[in-house]
């Protein structure tokens, strides 16, 4: 109910295809239209983006063509606006890196797209998911009437929250034993260890 209330408030709007023609980065366009709550980091590019997304850094967040094909699937790898606009390929390189935080100083905490995913999951109504997909390039690819809605929602989470950390909490909430593509059980990783200072000074046993 709360997700629908946010959507229907009219205060936020999903990206339109015409907005992609602007000379702006994907991160900037999303932050201006779809961010409900975010953190402003004044030195995002200088202090952080250069490390994880900069041209010369050895710690860049790379993603290979093969991995992109797995994440976006078919026909998404060819039509998905995120796949087309969110990654950067530098001259002479074969791997893309995430360009989501180029030209923007905001880290998303809550986005309108997540409201659509929550509404779809809570109601079981695939029209909420289809609306989000329409605003990501899938307007000519409607979901099948008999689609596995849970699987489709998970696939959308994997595409929508790249380099944001939100997917971890989706898996944690659903208590996935193992993450896709991984063999190690996740149970022990869902709860972070208590900080040493908390144990020492917090009277915690």
Regions of interest found by a model, annotated:
Residues 1-55, 72-205:
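Acidic/polar-rich alpha-helix caps and helix-coil junctions
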Residues 64:
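Acidic/Gly/His-enriched mid-domain segments of enzyme catalytic cores or analogous surface patches
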């Amino acid at each position: 109910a709360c997700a629908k209330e946010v959507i229907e408030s009219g205060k936020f709007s999903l990206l339109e295809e015409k907005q992609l023609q602007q000379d702006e980065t994907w991160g900037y366009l999303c932050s201006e239209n779809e961010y409900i709550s975010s953190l402003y980091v004044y030195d995002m590019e200088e202090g952080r983006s250069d490390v994880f997304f900069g041209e010369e850094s050895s710690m860049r967040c790379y993603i290979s063509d093969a991995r992109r094909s797995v994440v976006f699937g078919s026909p998404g790898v060819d039509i998905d606006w995120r796949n087309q606009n969110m990654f950067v390929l530098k001259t002479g390189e074969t791997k893309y890196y995430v360009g989501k935080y180029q030209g923007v100083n905001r880290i998303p905490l809550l986005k309108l797209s997540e409201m659509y995913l929550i509404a779809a999951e809570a109601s079981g109504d695939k029209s909420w998911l289809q609306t989000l997909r329409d605003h990501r390039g899938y307007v000519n690819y409607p979901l099948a009437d008999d689609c596995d809605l849970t699987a489709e929602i998970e696939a959308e989470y994997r595409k929508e929250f790249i380099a944001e950390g939100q997917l971890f909490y989706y898996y944690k909430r659903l208590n996935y034993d193992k993450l896709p593509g991984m063999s190690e059980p996740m149970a022990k990783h869902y709860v972070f260890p208590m900080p040493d200072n908390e144990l020492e000074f917090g009277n915690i046993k």
